[in-house]
């Protein structure tokens, strides 16, 4: 949020959204971005109506928020501006982050909300299982290194690892969840 915003919690945002349906704007890095999907899920659960303002990347959205062209931003690109004091954090889409321990997850306010942005490593079809397991072991070791954890935390990120099968299961669950959000919100990709 812009520091000038009257909202100081996600609950404040929801109250404003309920009092003024279709008035509050939120920026994201684009249509179909994880941040867009997260806010569509919020609207679905809370029965609120917000106006999505998609940008061509997070940096443009951050600039728009600082310039008070939008009411709020849902994008990791804002982390540097939060740390620099130019923006105030209200909530994160996943669980609390070590880098922002006083910033609650949306799920702490919106019952049933569960959404995290994530990255994963994939290998070409047909890659031997032994190679996949070895890569997974190497990634786990790298993710456990204190300097890697510290660097990720400095970017507002946290490393979480899994087994290859857990990741396959996660992909399936996420694909189904995003599909439901897209269908319910009638999102069209151009």
Regions picked out by a protein language model, each given a short descriptive name:
Residues 22-103:
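Ligand-binding pocket segment of bilobal, Venus flytrap-like solute-binding proteins
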Residues 16, 20, 68, 76, ...:
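Generic structural signal for alpha-helix termini and adjacent loop/cap motifs
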């Amino acid at each position: 949020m812009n520091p000038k915003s009257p909202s100081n919690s996600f609950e404040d945002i929801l109250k404003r959204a309920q009092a003024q349906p279709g008035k509050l704007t939120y920026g994201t890095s684009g249509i179909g971005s994880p941040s867009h999907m997260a806010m569509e899920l919020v609207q679905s659960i809370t029965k609120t109506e917000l106006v999505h303002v998609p940008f061509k990347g997070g940096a443009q959205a951050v600039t728009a928020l600082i310039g008070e062209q939008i009411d709020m931003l849902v994008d990791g690109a804002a982390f540097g501006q939060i740390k620099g004091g130019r923006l105030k954090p209200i909530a994160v889409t996943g669980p609390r982050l070590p880098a922002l321990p006083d910033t609650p997850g949306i799920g702490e306010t919106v019952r049933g909300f569960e959404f995290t942005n994530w990255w994963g490593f994939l290998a070409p079809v047909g890659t031997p299982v032994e190679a996949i397991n070895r890569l997974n072991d190497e990634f786990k070791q790298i993710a456990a290194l204190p300097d890697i954890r510290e660097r990720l935390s400095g970017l507002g990120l946290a490393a979480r690892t899994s087994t290859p099968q857990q990741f396959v299961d996660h992909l399936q669950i996420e694909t189904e969840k995003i599909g439901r959000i897209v269908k319910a919100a009638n999102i069209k990709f151009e």
